Amino acid sequence: VWEDASNKIAYSERRRYFGGGELDSVMNYPLRDAILAYLNGGTAEHFAETMETLRENYPRDVFYNLMNIIGTHDTARALTVLGVMSEDWKKSRDERAHYELPPDRLETAKRRLRLAAVIQFTMPGSPTIYYGDEAGRQGFEDPFNRRTYPWGAEDREILAFYRRLCEVRADSETLIRGELRFDTGENDALLRYERTLGRSRIIILVNRSRQEVRTGVNALYALDLLTQREFDCEDSSGIEITVPAETAYLLRCFGSAE
């Protein structure tokens, strides 16, 4: 199911996938599309609206059990989508078959891929990795996206980042079961949302722009789960955080500013 599965119509018939007798989950293509659109220049507000529509339309158990993807056997590789120019899609089939991102575009794509993975791993649902994405595999549409895993030639930097995300996700019941709340409107380029479970609170900040972004966090102390960097409150107004360009923070927050 490539779109919102709650109102899917196929062969002139409305599908009842979530009526209790058919599907427990689907591949979350709307999330994939929203992530890639946001990272390629879309707004944080549009991303949030897309996710809120899914949350409204899907049963809660389904929403928290979706296969959260950024790549599959039916789509171009995420690294390629995040690095190519619009005119590259017009290349001949033979050119696409042998295409590799030039060094400058590859570095841009790698930074964006890390942001995509952060969103994938921190939204409700089950993060599902298409083999090779975690190793820096490139490729346009089928069959170029189905090359074998690059054994011995993995991008070690990307692989290490994915491993760290897996550790953070596995260790956090808040990211697995917590409530979701978006906080948008402050900056089109800054995607900001919060996962909460009881007293546990994690704020995710994703800055897709090429400039740093400053934002406030209502906490006395925060720890970035990816890097273990600490942030302290300097006054009663909370913590002022500068998110570097094309960077994400996963902030476990403690306390509340007055």
Residue ranges and their predicted role:
Residues 1-66, 119, 136-164, 195-198, ...:
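Active-site-proximal helices and loops of the catalytic beta/alpha 8
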Residues 4, 30, 70, 226-229:
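Residues at the C-termini of beta-strands that transition into short coil/loop
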Residues 15, 68-101, 117-156:
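Aromatic/acidic polysaccharide-binding cleft in carbohydrate-active enzymes
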Residues 44-52, 88-113, 171:
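Aromatic-anchored helix/helix-loop segment that forms the rim or "lid"
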Residues 57-64, 106-114:
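Structural motif
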Residues 109-110, 122-129, 133-258:
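Carbohydrate-interacting/catalytic domains
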